[in-house]
Design a protein with these regions (language model features):
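Charged catalytic cores and adjacent phosphate/nucleic-acid-binding surfaces used
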Residues: 5, 10-13, 23-129
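Acidic/histidine-rich, metal-coordinating catalytic segments
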Residues: 18
Length: 129
């Protein structure tokens, strides 16, 4: 938990990925709440349930918490083969079932992604070294 909390507080970190693995339990609510406070994104990874058995329940809890705390997410296929790029039917179904707000999905469309990237660029401290 502390490692995730420390990570979301680092100005150069934009997103927490692969957070639904049951092999690495953490205080999901504390991390999602802090990610929202710090303007960070939580990845929703389509491959989690395939590559990390047991992660679907954790991912569902994390997505629900993201909705509750208005934490932005990024949905991705985590494709390991070219035909899987952009393919995330399980994640889409989960988001629909939870009525997850589209405005919290930073890559729902190109405008939202551009807006997020511009916002993050303004927030990051400039290197002066």
């Amino acid at each position: 938990t502390q490692a995730y909390l420390n990570a979301v507080r680092i100005p150069w970190v934009d997103m927490i990925g692969h957070s639904g693995s049951p092999a690495f339990p953490f205080d999901e609510e504390a991390v999602v709440r802090e990610a929202a406070r710090c303007g960070k994104v939580i990845e929703v990874n389509e491959s989690s349930s395939k590559s990390r058995p047991g992660s679907e329940d954790a991912c569902l809890r994390i997505i629900s918490l993201c909705k509750q705390y208005h934490t932005r997410i990024c949905v991705d296929s985590d494709a390991h083969f070219c035909s899987q790029v952009g393919d995330f039917p399980k994640s889409s179904r989960l988001l629909d079932e939870l009525q997850f707000p589209k405005e919290l999905v930073i890559n729902a469309d190109i405008r939202q992604l551009d807006d997020y990237l511009e916002e993050r660029q303004r927030q990051k401290p400039k290197c002066t070294a």
